[in-house]
Swiss-Prot record:
Source species: Homo sapiens
Keyword Cell cycle assigned: yes
Family per similarity comment: Belongs to the protein kinase superfamily. Tyr protein kinase family. SRC subfamily.
Region described as Disordered: spans on this chain: 1-53
Membrane-protein topology: Lipid-anchor
Cellular component GO terms, alphabetical: actin filament; caveola; cell junction; cell-cell junction; cytoplasm; cytosol; extracellular exosome; focal adhesion
Purpose: Non-receptor protein tyrosine kinase which is activated following engagement of many different classes of cellular receptors including immune response receptors, integrins and other adhesion receptors, receptor protein tyrosine kinases, G protein-coupled receptors as well as cytokine receptors. Participates in signaling pathways that control a diverse spectrum of biological activities including gene transcription, immune response, cell adhesion, cell cycle progression, apoptosis, migration, and transformation.
Gene: SRC
Official protein name in the record: Proto-oncogene tyrosine-protein kinase Src
Lineage start: Eukaryota, Metazoa, Chordata, Craniata, Vertebrata
Keywords: ATP-binding, Cell adhesion, Cell cycle, Cell junction, Cell membrane, Cytoplasm, Cytoskeleton, Disease variant, Host-virus interaction, Immunity, Kinase, Lipoprotein, Membrane, Mitochondrion, Mitochondrion inner membrane, Myristate, Nucleotide-binding, Nucleus, Phosphoprotein, Proto-oncogene, SH2 domain, SH3 domain, Transferase, Tyrosine-protein kinase, Ubl conjugation
Regulation: Phosphorylation by CSK at Tyr-530 inhibits kinase activity. Inhibitory phosphorylation at Tyr-530 is enhanced by heme. Further phosphorylation by CDK1 partially reactivates CSK-inactivated SRC and facilitates complete reactivation by protein tyrosine phosphatase PTPRC. Integrin engagement stimulates kinase activity. Phosphorylation by PTK2/FAK1 enhances kinase activity. Butein and pseudosubstrate-based peptide inhibitors like CIYKYYF act as inhibitors. Phosphorylation at Tyr-419 increases kinase activity.
Disease cited in the entry: SRC kinase activity has been shown to be increased in several tumor tissues and tumor cell lines such as colon carcinoma cells. Thrombocytopenia 6: A form of thrombocytopenia, a hematologic disorder defined by a decrease in the number of platelets in circulating blood, resulting in the potential for increased bleeding and decreased ability for clotting. THC6 is an autosomal dominant form. Affected individuals may also have bone abnormalities and an increased risk for myelofibrosis.
Cited InterPro entries: Kinase-like_dom_sf, Non-receptor_tyrosine_kinases, Prot_kinase_dom, Protein_kinase_ATP_BS, Ser-Thr/Tyr_kinase_cat_dom, SH2, SH2_dom_sf, SH3-like_dom_sf
């Protein structure tokens, strides 16, 4: 296979078959809720897909909220840090310039890096057009490298590979190659399959490395390169569930920021187009930045929070990067404060659950959404950060049931008396752990409590927690040991997980790392006999 191929960007993109095998060696045969958005075109960047390589911009070391802003903060990557002075790269996706200083390019184009490969935006020279400008570093990979192959998805998890492959539109044999989660230096081939008993499912094959540098799935059939292995199995199943037919489609990743040095931006660069929702402290809009880029814009009412405190916190928030967190792009730091983030096409999870689509969601989809949220929060946990306002209204939904955590960290900055009293009308008491509501002790463990409440929102399709109870009553009852009963049709094992999140002593509550693992393996380890019901 040619090594200049890159991943397709959109599920709608025409899928390509693999080229014939070559030189095969070896024997062998076989806060701010957003409402459901209007039907509008998606942003140019797409909304889904594994995060790609980037190196965070250099920053002044500053400890803030337990988070060291000089740390390198990354989510699972397609390509790792670069070594060996590689300067020629190949474009993995099309990119349309957003400013006068960045560079448009097409997928497959070869680019010469002009400056060093640090930061999120690199100065590059196109070998096709002769033009020079800044490019998003996660849209390119070193020429003739494994990262430049369209089927190579890098450091994504087994569960994430299954999310991508279990699309009903994918034919049998749709595949990707990823890093092994369990064996350092090894890879995994993930392939979609179908049978009458299991329906659509995914098989995973470990690709082992020879001491000589070659690769094999079965020792009788060995290859000099991963490219040769993929090309061979595209012609011969040879023990696999099916021959490899089509590279798994995915969307372009978000760029890291809107453009080089586009952090504090002028208000005039934003156009507010469609109002998506309104909360106690502001509004949410779909809009455009610089006339080129689809974004979501939160506008805060003057007096909601101190601009100075917000800007300080935002410097930390923008370094939190994970594929299950809504990315903070830019800010307008003078009042009224504007917060510019990636746009999520399906709006808030709360509205999504209560809407038309919610009726058709069953437990497997709901548990998967919960696992995605837990994955984002496990990253927040690793970064020693605290969300403080985790609930369905602050989760955003994109295409293919992708869920991302939004509004992390903002709640701490709100200066409204009805909120800071913690028992005022604007405070989300029903989602808040007792030690946080009563004594202001907000930690990642109070976020775990809130996650347990969010699980009830998922399993009841958006019902308000503690139905029939007012805030003051909820606080009193919970302090006396009351916990919500198991929702109708919800398995006891899932209710038991909720109750673990609601343990009185914060340190006895599970970690988000545990919650993620439990939910990702739920239908294999906990409820293998699950059968769909009327609502779940």
């Amino acid at each position: 296979m040619g090594s200049n191929k890159s991943k397709p960007k959109d599920a709608s993109q025409r899928r390509r078959s693999l080229e014939p095998a070559e030189n095969v060696h070896g024997a062998g045969g076989g806060a701010f809720p957003a409402s459901q958005t209007p039907s509008k075109p998606a942003s140019a960047d797409g909304h889904r897909g594994p995060s790609a390589a980037f190196a965070p911009a250099a920053a002044e070391p500053k400890l803030f909220g337990g988070f060291n802003s000089s740390d390198t903060v990354t989510s699972p990557q397609r390509a790792g840090p670069l070594a060996g002075g590689v300067t020629t790269f190949v474009a993995l996706y099309d990119y349309e310039s957003r400013t006068e200083t960045d560079l448009s390019f097409k997928k497959g184009e070869r680019l010469q890096i002009v400056n060093n490969t640090e930061g999120d935006w690199w100065l590059a020279h196109s070998l096709s057009t002769g033009q020079t400008g800044y490019i998003p570093s996660n849209y390119v990979a070193p020429s003739d490298s494994i990262q430049a192959e369209e089927w190579y998805f890098g450091k994504i998890t087994r569960r994430e590979s299954e999310r991508l492959l279990l699309n009903a539109e994918n034919p049998r044999g749709t595949f990707l190659v990823r890093e092994s989660e369990t064996t350092k230096g090894a890879y995994c081939l993930s392939v979609s399959d179908f049978d009458n008993a299991k329906g659509l499912n995914v098989k995973h094959y470990k690709i082992r490395k020879l001491d000589s540098g070659g690769f094999y799935i079965t020792s009788r059939t060995q290859f000099n390169s991963l490219q040769q292995l993929v090309a061979y199995y595209s012609k011969h199943a040879d023990g696999l569930c099916h021959r490899l037919t089509t590279v798994c489609p995915t969307s372009k990743p978000q760029t890291q920021g809107l453009a080089k040095d586009a952090w504090e931006i002028p208000r005039e660069s934003l156009r507010l187009e469609v109002k998506l929702g309104q909360g106690c402290f502001g509004e949410v809009w779909m809009g455009t930045w610089n006339g080129t880029t689809r974004v979501a814009i939160k506008t805060l009412k003057p007096g909601t929070m101190s601009p100075e405190a917000f800007l300080q916190e935002a410097q930390v928030m923008k370094k939190l990067r994970h594929e299950k967190l809504v990315q903070l792009y830019a800010v307008v730091s003078e009042e009224p404060i504007y917060i510019v983030t990636e746009y999520m096409s399906k709006g808030s999870l709360l509205d999504f659950l209560k809407g038309e689509t919610g009726k058709y969601l069953r437990l497997p989809q709901l548990v998967d959404m919960a696992a995605q949220i837990a994955s984002g929060m496990a990253y927040v946990e690793r970064m020693n950060y605290v969300h403080r306002d985790l609930r369905a209204a602050n989760i955003l939904v994109g295409e293919n049931l992708v869920c991302k955590v939004a509004d992390f960290g903002l709640a701490r900055l709100i200066e409204d008396n009805e909120y800071t009293a913690r028992q005022g009308a604007k405070f989300p008491i029903k989602w808040t752990a007792p030690e946080a509501a009563l004594y202001g002790r907000f930690t990642i463990k109070s976020d775990v409590w809130s996650f347990g409440i969010l699980l009830t929102e998922l399993t009841t399709k958006g019902r308000v927690p503690y139905p029939g109870m007012v805030n003051r009553e909820v606080l009193d009852q919970v302090e006396r040991g009351y916990r919500m009963p198991c929702p109708p049709e919800c398995p006891e094992s899932l209710h038991d997980l909720m109750c673990q999140c609601w343990r009185k002593e914060p340190e006895e509550r599970p970690t988000f790392e545990y919650l993620q693992a439990f939910l990702e393996d739920y239908f294999t380890s906990t409820e293998p006999q699950y059968q769909p019901g009327e609502n779940l």
